[in-house]
Protein backbone atom coordinates (compact mmCIF):
# COMPACT_ATOMS: atom_id res chain seq x y z
CA UNK A 1 0.00 0.00 0.00
CA UNK A 2 3.06 2.29 -0.09
CA UNK A 3 2.03 3.94 -3.36
CA UNK A 4 -1.49 4.55 -2.01
CA UNK A 5 -0.43 6.40 1.13
CA UNK A 6 -0.38 9.92 -0.41
CA UNK A 7 -4.00 9.51 -1.58
CA UNK A 8 -5.04 8.06 1.80
CA UNK A 9 -3.54 10.95 3.75
CA UNK A 10 -5.15 13.44 1.36
CA UNK A 11 -8.58 11.93 2.00
CA UNK A 12 -8.27 11.44 5.76
CA UNK A 13 -5.99 14.46 6.46
CA UNK A 14 -3.85 12.04 8.46
CA UNK A 15 -0.20 12.62 7.59
CA UNK A 16 0.62 12.09 11.27
CA UNK A 17 -0.65 8.48 11.04
CA UNK A 18 1.49 7.35 8.10
CA UNK A 19 3.88 5.37 10.30
CA UNK A 20 1.03 3.47 11.95
CA UNK A 21 -0.38 2.21 8.64
CA UNK A 22 2.67 -0.02 8.30
CA UNK A 23 3.59 -0.49 11.97
CA UNK A 24 0.15 -1.75 13.08
CA UNK A 25 0.39 -4.55 10.49
CA UNK A 26 4.01 -5.41 11.22
CA UNK A 27 3.53 -5.48 15.00
CA UNK A 28 0.73 -8.04 15.04
CA UNK A 29 2.35 -10.03 12.24
CA UNK A 30 5.76 -10.23 13.89
CA UNK A 31 4.60 -10.97 17.42
CA UNK A 32 2.02 -13.65 16.62
CA UNK A 33 3.74 -15.62 13.84
CA UNK A 34 5.34 -18.04 16.31
CA UNK A 35 2.06 -18.46 18.21
CA UNK A 36 0.43 -19.66 15.00
CA UNK A 37 3.36 -22.06 14.59
CA UNK A 38 2.46 -23.51 17.99
CA UNK A 39 -1.20 -23.83 16.98
CA UNK A 40 -0.18 -25.71 13.83
CA UNK A 41 1.49 -28.35 16.03
CA UNK A 42 -1.57 -28.68 18.31
CA UNK A 43 -4.50 -28.61 15.86
CA UNK A 44 -5.11 -29.70 12.25
CA UNK A 45 -3.38 -27.27 9.91
CA UNK A 46 -6.50 -27.00 7.74
CA UNK A 47 -8.67 -25.35 10.39
CA UNK A 48 -6.02 -23.05 11.85
CA UNK A 49 -5.14 -21.88 8.33
CA UNK A 50 -8.80 -21.09 7.64
CA UNK A 51 -8.98 -19.07 10.88
CA UNK A 52 -5.91 -17.08 9.83
CA UNK A 53 -7.39 -16.53 6.37
CA UNK A 54 -10.68 -15.34 7.88
CA UNK A 55 -8.84 -12.81 10.06
CA UNK A 56 -6.91 -11.56 7.03
CA UNK A 57 -10.14 -11.13 5.06
CA UNK A 58 -11.88 -9.33 7.94
CA UNK A 59 -8.94 -6.95 8.22
CA UNK A 60 -9.01 -6.27 4.48
CA UNK A 61 -12.75 -5.61 4.67
CA UNK A 62 -12.28 -3.11 7.50
CA UNK A 63 -9.48 -1.34 5.59
CA UNK A 64 -11.52 -1.16 2.39
CA UNK A 65 -14.66 0.30 3.94
CA UNK A 66 -13.21 2.39 6.77
CA UNK A 67 -14.42 6.01 6.94
CA UNK A 68 -11.38 7.31 8.81
CA UNK A 69 -7.70 6.82 9.60
CA UNK A 70 -8.28 5.06 12.93
CA UNK A 71 -10.35 2.40 11.20
CA UNK A 72 -7.57 1.85 8.67
CA UNK A 73 -5.02 1.34 11.46
CA UNK A 74 -7.32 -1.15 13.20
CA UNK A 75 -7.95 -2.98 9.94
CA UNK A 76 -4.23 -3.19 9.23
CA UNK A 77 -3.64 -4.67 12.70
CA UNK A 78 -6.29 -7.35 12.08
CA UNK A 79 -4.80 -8.07 8.65
CA UNK A 80 -1.37 -8.50 10.23
CA UNK A 81 -2.84 -10.90 12.77
CA UNK A 82 -4.25 -13.07 10.00
CA UNK A 83 -1.15 -12.93 7.83
CA UNK A 84 0.90 -14.15 10.81
CA UNK A 85 -0.60 -17.58 10.24
CA UNK A 86 -0.88 -17.64 6.45
CA UNK A 87 2.75 -17.79 5.35
CA UNK A 88 3.97 -20.35 7.90
CA UNK A 89 0.74 -22.29 7.38
CA UNK A 90 1.33 -22.59 3.64
CA UNK A 91 4.85 -23.96 4.19
CA UNK A 92 3.53 -26.34 6.88
CA UNK A 93 0.88 -27.69 4.49
CA UNK A 94 3.60 -28.45 1.95
CA UNK A 95 5.85 -30.07 4.58
CA UNK A 96 3.03 -32.45 5.57
CA UNK A 97 1.91 -33.25 2.03
CA UNK A 98 5.00 -34.47 0.18
CA UNK A 99 8.59 -35.72 0.66
CA UNK A 100 11.38 -33.18 1.05
CA UNK A 101 12.76 -33.58 -2.47
CA UNK A 102 9.37 -32.65 -3.96
CA UNK A 103 8.91 -29.72 -1.60
CA UNK A 104 11.86 -27.77 -3.00
CA UNK A 105 10.10 -26.38 -6.04
CA UNK A 106 6.88 -25.67 -4.13
CA UNK A 107 8.73 -23.78 -1.41
CA UNK A 108 10.69 -21.84 -4.01
CA UNK A 109 7.47 -20.88 -5.78
CA UNK A 110 5.94 -19.63 -2.52
CA UNK A 111 9.06 -17.71 -1.50
CA UNK A 112 9.35 -16.35 -5.02
CA UNK A 113 5.75 -15.13 -4.92
CA UNK A 114 6.41 -13.64 -1.49
CA UNK A 115 9.35 -11.67 -2.85
CA UNK A 116 7.64 -10.75 -6.10
CA UNK A 117 4.60 -9.50 -4.18
CA UNK A 118 6.80 -7.14 -2.17
CA UNK A 119 8.36 -5.79 -5.36
CA UNK A 120 5.24 -5.83 -7.56
CA UNK A 121 2.95 -4.54 -4.81
CA UNK A 122 3.81 -0.88 -5.51
CA UNK A 123 3.02 -1.46 -9.20
CA UNK A 124 -0.42 -2.96 -8.54
CA UNK A 125 -1.16 -0.44 -5.79
CA UNK A 126 -0.14 2.36 -8.12
CA UNK A 127 -2.51 1.14 -10.84
CA UNK A 128 -5.43 0.93 -8.38
CA UNK A 129 -4.62 4.34 -6.92
CA UNK A 130 -4.12 6.06 -10.27
CA UNK A 131 -7.10 4.54 -12.12
CA UNK A 132 -9.62 3.33 -9.48
CA UNK A 133 -9.34 4.08 -5.77
CA UNK A 134 -6.83 3.23 -3.06
CA UNK A 135 -9.53 1.08 -1.43
CA UNK A 136 -9.05 -1.51 -4.18
CA UNK A 137 -5.65 -2.28 -2.59
CA UNK A 138 -7.77 -4.05 0.05
CA UNK A 139 -10.88 -5.05 -1.92
CA UNK A 140 -8.71 -7.22 -4.18
CA UNK A 141 -7.93 -9.53 -1.24
CA UNK A 142 -11.58 -10.50 -0.74
CA UNK A 143 -12.33 -12.58 -3.88
CA UNK A 144 -8.92 -14.24 -3.87
CA UNK A 145 -9.26 -15.05 -0.18
CA UNK A 146 -12.70 -16.53 -0.80
CA UNK A 147 -11.41 -18.77 -3.59
CA UNK A 148 -8.51 -19.87 -1.40
CA UNK A 149 -10.89 -20.75 1.44
CA UNK A 150 -13.02 -22.89 -0.89
CA UNK A 151 -9.93 -24.71 -2.16
CA UNK A 152 -8.73 -25.39 1.39
CA UNK A 153 -12.14 -26.64 2.55
CA UNK A 154 -12.65 -29.08 -0.33
CA UNK A 155 -9.13 -30.09 -1.32
CA UNK A 156 -7.02 -30.16 1.86
CA UNK A 157 -7.32 -33.12 4.20
CA UNK A 158 -7.50 -32.33 7.92
CA UNK A 159 -4.48 -34.32 9.13
CA UNK A 160 -3.94 -35.10 12.78
CA UNK A 161 -1.63 -32.64 14.57
CA UNK A 162 1.82 -33.73 15.72
CA UNK A 163 0.78 -33.07 19.35
CA UNK A 164 -2.49 -33.04 21.26
CA UNK A 165 -3.62 -29.69 22.65
CA UNK A 166 -5.46 -31.08 25.66
CA UNK A 167 -7.73 -28.71 27.57
CA UNK A 168 -7.81 -24.92 27.61
CA UNK A 169 -5.26 -24.77 30.42
CA UNK A 170 -2.82 -26.93 28.44
CA UNK A 171 -3.41 -24.84 25.31
CA UNK A 172 -2.69 -21.58 27.13
CA UNK A 173 0.46 -23.12 28.56
CA UNK A 174 1.68 -24.10 25.08
CA UNK A 175 0.93 -20.63 23.69
CA UNK A 176 3.24 -19.07 26.30
CA UNK A 177 1.09 -16.02 27.04
CA UNK A 178 3.61 -14.92 29.66
CA UNK A 179 6.35 -14.80 27.03
CA UNK A 180 4.10 -12.92 24.57
CA UNK A 181 3.28 -10.42 27.31
CA UNK A 182 6.94 -9.34 27.22
CA UNK A 183 7.71 -9.98 23.53
CA UNK A 184 4.92 -7.79 22.15
CA UNK A 185 5.89 -4.56 23.98
CA UNK A 186 9.59 -5.31 23.37
CA UNK A 187 9.02 -5.32 19.60
CA UNK A 188 6.96 -2.12 19.90
CA UNK A 189 9.80 -0.42 21.80
CA UNK A 190 12.37 -1.62 19.25
CA UNK A 191 10.43 -0.38 16.23
CA UNK A 192 9.68 2.98 17.87
CA UNK A 193 13.36 3.47 18.72
CA UNK A 194 14.42 2.66 15.17
CA UNK A 195 11.69 4.87 13.67
CA UNK A 196 12.09 7.90 15.94
CA UNK A 197 15.79 7.85 16.81
CA UNK A 198 17.74 10.48 14.91
CA UNK A 199 14.67 11.52 12.87
CA UNK A 200 11.89 12.72 15.20
CA UNK A 201 14.04 12.90 18.33
CA UNK A 202 17.80 12.99 18.98
CA UNK A 203 19.34 9.79 20.27
CA UNK A 204 19.96 11.34 23.69
CA UNK A 205 16.30 12.36 24.09
CA UNK A 206 14.68 10.94 27.22
CA UNK A 207 11.96 9.25 25.16
CA UNK A 208 14.48 7.36 23.04
CA UNK A 209 16.57 6.42 26.08
CA UNK A 210 13.41 5.24 27.86
CA UNK A 211 12.43 3.07 24.91
CA UNK A 212 15.92 1.55 24.72
CA UNK A 213 15.85 0.76 28.45
CA UNK A 214 12.33 -0.64 28.10
CA UNK A 215 13.29 -2.85 25.16
CA UNK A 216 16.38 -4.16 26.96
CA UNK A 217 14.48 -4.98 30.14
CA UNK A 218 11.57 -6.60 28.33
CA UNK A 219 13.71 -8.75 26.05
CA UNK A 220 15.84 -9.93 28.98
CA UNK A 221 12.72 -10.98 30.88
CA UNK A 222 11.44 -12.69 27.71
CA UNK A 223 14.69 -14.70 27.47
CA UNK A 224 14.36 -15.75 31.12
CA UNK A 225 10.76 -16.84 30.51
CA UNK A 226 11.86 -18.88 27.47
CA UNK A 227 14.50 -20.66 29.52
CA UNK A 228 11.95 -21.35 32.26
CA UNK A 229 9.23 -22.65 29.91
CA UNK A 230 11.60 -24.83 27.80
CA UNK A 231 9.53 -26.84 25.26
CA UNK A 232 6.40 -24.81 26.04
CA UNK A 233 8.20 -21.53 25.35
CA UNK A 234 7.45 -19.29 22.38
CA UNK A 235 11.00 -20.00 21.17
CA UNK A 236 12.10 -23.33 22.74
CA UNK A 237 15.79 -23.10 23.76
CA UNK A 238 16.56 -26.60 22.46
CA UNK A 239 15.61 -25.45 18.94
CA UNK A 240 17.33 -22.10 18.87
CA UNK A 241 20.57 -23.65 20.21
CA UNK A 242 20.91 -25.75 17.06
CA UNK A 243 23.42 -24.12 14.72
CA UNK A 244 21.31 -24.66 11.63
CA UNK A 245 18.34 -22.94 13.26
CA UNK A 246 20.10 -19.86 14.62
CA UNK A 247 22.07 -19.64 11.39
CA UNK A 248 18.92 -19.64 9.26
CA UNK A 249 17.34 -17.14 11.66
CA UNK A 250 20.17 -14.66 11.08
CA UNK A 251 20.17 -15.35 7.34
CA UNK A 252 16.39 -14.87 7.07
CA UNK A 253 16.49 -11.65 9.09
CA UNK A 254 19.23 -10.15 6.93
CA UNK A 255 18.24 -11.26 3.43
CA UNK A 256 14.57 -10.32 3.92
CA UNK A 257 15.55 -7.04 5.57
CA UNK A 258 17.78 -6.18 2.61
CA UNK A 259 14.95 -6.92 0.20
CA UNK A 260 12.47 -4.77 2.12
CA UNK A 261 14.85 -1.82 2.44
CA UNK A 262 15.22 -1.71 -1.33
CA UNK A 263 11.66 -2.55 -2.38
CA UNK A 264 10.40 0.24 -0.10
CA UNK A 265 12.88 2.97 -1.12
CA UNK A 266 13.71 2.23 -4.76
CA UNK A 267 10.18 3.23 -5.89
CA UNK A 268 10.65 6.47 -3.93
CA UNK A 269 13.82 7.13 -5.96
CA UNK A 270 11.98 6.48 -9.22
CA UNK A 271 9.06 8.74 -8.28
CA UNK A 272 10.94 11.62 -6.64
CA UNK A 273 14.28 11.76 -8.48
CA UNK A 274 13.10 10.49 -11.88
CA UNK A 275 9.63 12.05 -11.61
CA UNK A 276 7.66 9.03 -12.81
CA UNK A 277 4.19 7.91 -11.71
CA UNK A 278 3.48 5.25 -9.10
CA UNK A 279 2.56 2.81 -11.86
CA UNK A 280 5.72 3.41 -13.87
CA UNK A 281 7.92 3.13 -10.76
CA UNK A 282 6.54 -0.38 -10.34
CA UNK A 283 7.34 -1.21 -13.95
CA UNK A 284 10.89 0.05 -13.45
CA UNK A 285 11.31 -2.56 -10.67
CA UNK A 286 10.69 -5.46 -13.07
CA UNK A 287 14.43 -6.35 -13.36
CA UNK A 288 14.41 -7.27 -9.67
CA UNK A 289 11.21 -9.28 -10.09
CA UNK A 290 12.58 -11.21 -13.07
CA UNK A 291 15.88 -11.95 -11.33
CA UNK A 292 14.09 -13.23 -8.25
CA UNK A 293 11.54 -15.31 -10.13
CA UNK A 294 13.86 -17.05 -12.57
CA UNK A 295 16.65 -17.72 -10.09
CA UNK A 296 14.36 -18.87 -7.29
CA UNK A 297 12.91 -21.59 -9.50
CA UNK A 298 16.31 -22.44 -10.99
CA UNK A 299 17.91 -22.77 -7.55
CA UNK A 300 15.15 -25.17 -6.46
CA UNK A 301 15.89 -27.41 -9.44
CA UNK A 302 19.64 -27.28 -8.79
CA UNK A 303 19.27 -28.03 -5.07
CA UNK A 304 17.22 -31.08 -5.99
CA UNK A 305 19.90 -32.19 -8.46
CA UNK A 306 23.03 -31.69 -6.35
CA UNK A 307 21.32 -32.26 -3.00
CA UNK A 308 22.90 -29.32 -1.15
CA UNK A 309 21.45 -25.89 -0.40
CA UNK A 310 24.54 -24.50 1.36
CA UNK A 311 26.33 -23.21 -1.79
CA UNK A 312 23.28 -21.11 -2.65
CA UNK A 313 23.22 -19.62 0.85
CA UNK A 314 26.86 -18.61 0.36
CA UNK A 315 26.24 -17.14 -3.09
CA UNK A 316 23.09 -15.19 -2.20
CA UNK A 317 24.77 -12.59 0.08
CA UNK A 318 27.64 -12.13 -2.39
CA UNK A 319 25.38 -11.43 -5.36
CA UNK A 320 22.85 -9.37 -3.43
CA UNK A 321 25.50 -7.15 -1.82
CA UNK A 322 27.05 -6.50 -5.25
CA UNK A 323 23.69 -5.39 -6.61
CA UNK A 324 22.81 -3.48 -3.45
CA UNK A 325 26.15 -1.69 -3.44
CA UNK A 326 25.74 -0.69 -7.08
CA UNK A 327 22.18 0.56 -6.51
CA UNK A 328 23.42 2.74 -3.65
CA UNK A 329 25.64 4.60 -6.16
CA UNK A 330 22.70 5.84 -8.27
CA UNK A 331 22.86 9.51 -9.23
CA UNK A 332 20.25 12.00 -10.41
CA UNK A 333 21.39 11.51 -14.00
CA UNK A 334 21.72 7.69 -13.84
CA UNK A 335 20.10 6.12 -16.88
CA UNK A 336 18.41 2.78 -17.63
CA UNK A 337 21.76 1.03 -18.04
CA UNK A 338 22.47 1.72 -14.37
CA UNK A 339 19.10 1.26 -12.67
CA UNK A 340 18.27 -1.82 -14.75
CA UNK A 341 21.72 -3.41 -14.69
CA UNK A 342 22.22 -2.88 -10.96
CA UNK A 343 18.91 -4.55 -10.09
CA UNK A 344 19.85 -7.79 -11.87
CA UNK A 345 22.52 -9.14 -9.46
CA UNK A 346 20.42 -7.95 -6.53
CA UNK A 347 17.37 -9.85 -7.80
CA UNK A 348 19.45 -12.95 -8.53
CA UNK A 349 20.90 -12.92 -5.00
CA UNK A 350 17.45 -12.61 -3.45
CA UNK A 351 16.03 -15.30 -5.71
CA UNK A 352 18.56 -17.98 -4.80
CA UNK A 353 18.56 -17.08 -1.10
CA UNK A 354 15.01 -16.42 0.05
CA UNK A 355 13.71 -19.99 -0.10
CA UNK A 356 16.72 -21.78 1.38
CA UNK A 357 15.98 -21.22 5.13
CA UNK A 358 12.64 -23.01 4.80
CA UNK A 359 14.42 -25.94 3.15
CA UNK A 360 17.07 -26.06 5.89
CA UNK A 361 14.62 -26.39 8.80
CA UNK A 362 12.84 -29.26 7.05
CA UNK A 363 16.07 -31.04 6.18
CA UNK A 364 17.59 -31.03 9.66
CA UNK A 365 14.63 -31.35 12.06
CA UNK A 366 12.21 -34.08 13.02
CA UNK A 367 8.61 -33.72 11.73
CA UNK A 368 7.27 -32.75 15.17
CA UNK A 369 9.51 -29.66 15.26
CA UNK A 370 9.05 -28.47 11.66
CA UNK A 371 5.86 -26.34 12.05
CA UNK A 372 7.35 -24.35 14.94
CA UNK A 373 10.73 -23.98 13.21
CA UNK A 374 8.96 -22.70 10.09
CA UNK A 375 7.13 -20.14 12.25
CA UNK A 376 10.38 -19.04 13.92
CA UNK A 377 11.97 -18.54 10.50
CA UNK A 378 8.91 -16.61 9.29
CA UNK A 379 9.08 -14.47 12.44
CA UNK A 380 12.70 -13.58 11.75
CA UNK A 381 11.83 -12.70 8.15
CA UNK A 382 9.01 -10.44 9.32
CA UNK A 383 11.14 -8.87 12.03
CA UNK A 384 14.00 -8.32 9.59
CA UNK A 385 11.69 -6.52 7.19
CA UNK A 386 10.21 -4.41 9.98
CA UNK A 387 13.59 -3.38 11.36
CA UNK A 388 15.06 -2.68 7.92
CA UNK A 389 12.17 -0.44 6.87
CA UNK A 390 12.21 1.42 10.19
CA UNK A 391 15.96 2.05 10.13
CA UNK A 392 16.10 2.94 6.43
CA UNK A 393 13.13 5.29 6.74
CA UNK A 394 14.69 6.97 9.77
CA UNK A 395 17.95 7.44 7.83
CA UNK A 396 16.06 8.82 4.83
CA UNK A 397 14.07 11.34 6.85
CA UNK A 398 16.98 12.61 8.91
CA UNK A 399 19.40 12.79 5.99
CA UNK A 400 16.87 14.50 3.72
CA UNK A 401 16.56 17.41 6.13
CA UNK A 402 20.36 17.72 6.38
CA UNK A 403 20.91 17.36 2.64
CA UNK A 404 18.18 19.88 1.84
CA UNK A 405 19.84 22.44 4.09
CA UNK A 406 23.11 21.96 2.17
CA UNK A 407 21.85 21.56 -1.40
CA UNK A 408 18.75 23.78 -1.50
CA UNK A 409 18.35 25.80 1.72
CA UNK A 410 15.71 28.13 0.23
CA UNK A 411 13.53 25.42 -1.30
CA UNK A 412 11.16 24.91 1.64
CA UNK A 413 10.00 28.51 1.27
CA UNK A 414 8.03 27.22 -1.72
CA UNK A 415 6.25 24.45 0.18
CA UNK A 416 7.09 21.52 2.42
CA UNK A 417 9.57 19.98 0.00
CA UNK A 418 10.54 17.14 2.35
CA UNK A 419 7.03 15.66 2.06
CA UNK A 420 6.22 16.55 -1.57
CA UNK A 421 8.07 13.58 -3.03
CA UNK A 422 5.91 13.06 -6.11
CA UNK A 423 5.35 16.73 -7.02
CA UNK A 424 8.85 18.18 -6.83
CA UNK A 425 8.86 19.34 -10.45
CA UNK A 426 5.54 21.15 -9.92
CA UNK A 427 6.45 22.65 -6.54
CA UNK A 428 10.10 23.66 -6.80
CA UNK A 429 11.24 26.62 -8.93
CA UNK A 430 13.42 25.51 -11.88
CA UNK A 431 16.53 27.23 -10.52
CA UNK A 432 16.30 25.20 -7.28
CA UNK A 433 15.17 21.87 -8.72
CA UNK A 434 18.63 20.40 -9.33
CA UNK A 435 19.64 21.00 -5.70
CA UNK A 436 16.43 19.46 -4.38
CA UNK A 437 16.85 16.39 -6.59
CA UNK A 438 20.44 15.97 -5.40
CA UNK A 439 19.25 16.16 -1.78
CA UNK A 440 16.59 13.51 -2.40
CA UNK A 441 18.97 11.28 -4.33
CA UNK A 442 21.58 11.39 -1.59
CA UNK A 443 19.05 10.76 1.19
CA UNK A 444 17.61 7.74 -0.63
CA UNK A 445 21.00 6.21 -1.43
CA UNK A 446 22.04 6.73 2.19
CA UNK A 447 18.90 4.84 3.26
CA UNK A 448 19.86 2.05 0.83
CA UNK A 449 23.08 1.54 2.82
CA UNK A 450 20.88 -0.30 5.33
CA UNK A 451 20.11 -2.90 2.66
CA UNK A 452 23.78 -3.08 1.66
CA UNK A 453 24.78 -3.80 5.27
CA UNK A 454 22.11 -6.46 5.73
CA UNK A 455 23.02 -8.17 2.45
CA UNK A 456 26.62 -8.50 3.59
CA UNK A 457 25.65 -9.66 7.10
CA UNK A 458 23.57 -12.51 5.66
CA UNK A 459 26.81 -14.45 5.16
CA UNK A 460 27.14 -14.59 8.97
CA UNK A 461 23.97 -16.68 9.04
CA UNK A 462 25.03 -18.85 6.11
CA UNK A 463 28.42 -19.93 7.50
CA UNK A 464 27.11 -22.10 10.41
CA UNK A 465 24.76 -24.07 8.14
CA UNK A 466 25.85 -27.69 7.82
CA UNK A 467 26.22 -29.44 4.47
CA UNK A 468 23.13 -31.64 4.78
CA UNK A 469 21.85 -33.35 1.65
CA UNK A 470 18.14 -33.18 0.91
CA UNK A 471 18.52 -36.41 -1.08
CA UNK A 472 19.53 -38.46 1.95
CA UNK A 473 17.06 -39.70 4.54
CA UNK A 474 17.49 -37.69 7.73
CA UNK A 475 17.80 -39.80 10.84
CA UNK A 476 18.24 -37.14 13.48
CA UNK A 477 18.13 -33.43 14.06
CA UNK A 478 21.10 -31.15 14.13
CA UNK A 479 23.38 -31.14 17.16
Curated annotation (Swiss-Prot):
SUPFAM superfamilies: MFS general substrate transporter. GO terms for molecular function: transmembrane transporter activity. Its main location: membrane. The keyword RNA-binding does not apply. The chain crosses the membrane at residues 47-67, 71-91, 104-124, 136-156, 177-197, 208-228, 250-270, 283-303, 306-326, 344-364, 372-392, 442-462. Glycans are attached at residue 416. One of its GO terms (cellular component) is plasma membrane. It is a multi-pass membrane protein. The keyword Cell inner membrane does not apply. It is found in: Cell membrane. Keywords: Cell membrane, Glycoprotein, Membrane, Transmembrane, Transmembrane helix, Transport. InterPro entries: MFS, MFS_dom, MFS_trans_sf. Belongs to the major facilitator superfamily. TCR/Tet family. MFS-type transporter; part of the lnb gene cluster that mediates the biosynthesis of diastereomeric piperazines. Lna and lnb clusters encode sets of enzymes that produce overlapping sets of previously undescribed metabolites such as piperazinomycin-like metabolites or morpholine. The lna and lnb biosynthetic pathways appear to be part of a signaling network that controls the formation of sclerotia, a resilient overwintering structure. May be involved in the secretion of the metabolites produced by the lna and lnb clusters. This is MFS-type transporter lnaF.
